[in-house]
Amino acid sequence: MKKSILIAVLTASMATSAFAQWKPAGDKIKTKWAEQVNPENVLPEYPRPVMERGEWKNLNGLWNYAITEKGAVPSAYEGQILVPFAVESSLSGVGKKVSPDEELWYQRNFTVPATWKGKKVMLNFGAVDWKADIWVNDIKVGQHTGGFTPFSLDITAALAAKGDNKLVVKVWDPTDRGPQPRGKQVNRPEGIWYTAVTGIWQTVWMEPVAERHITIVRTSSD
């Protein structure tokens, strides 16, 4: 009983600590719902309307971040960013711009539930703007280009046998200096031209799947 109470107190303390470390970066385009954002429970719903799976783990929340010159590797992280809000946004807690000559780095640790043993583990990103490289335990597990499309990576072979796993994501977004569709996003916003959206901006999650599993569902009419 005492052990259960201690665990509950420690969990509550950690949640309070995380909340205290994060705050919006200014009041830019802030709505009444911004006050409800909690770093310990960010967009908790299953993010994919089709193919919802019973077992999954939400990786939204506070990650470490760094902004470096393009091609450089961070020697240390600058602080924490609230995923899945773009680094330029208020709710990210950062509110910084990333130039085409820079790259945005994310890092966090995660554990895999013991009940997933023997299954493939898929790492899913709802969207990352624009070009993303992903490593698990210093093993590159994939790359994706495109700021509006979800993607999944099989990270099973890169996982540690037990304990923590390290996830690193590097993002490069040239915005209007690149070839990608970008709407009104520009590097120098003014008038009708808007601030860029860089990095992870949709939910990140992982889930176990069988060796043979459904990857996509297409519906067609008669």
Q: For the regions a protein language model found, what residue spans apply to each?
A:
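Bacterial Sec-dependent N-terminal signal peptides
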Residues: 1-21
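N-terminal pre-domain segments of enzymes
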Residues: 21-56
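Short glycine/threonine/proline-enriched tight-turn/helix- or strand-capping micro-motif at secondary-structure
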Residues: 41-47, 89-93, 107
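Short coil-to-beta-strand transition motifs
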Residues: 54-58, 102-105
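Predominantly extracellular/luminal regions of secreted and cell-surface proteins
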Residues: 61-84
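Accessory beta-strand-rich segments of carbohydrate-active enzymes
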Residues: 64-68, 96-97, 101-214
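Aromatic- and Gly/Pro-rich amphipathic surface segment
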Residues: 76-98
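Short beta-strand segments of immunoglobulin-like
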Residues: 217-222
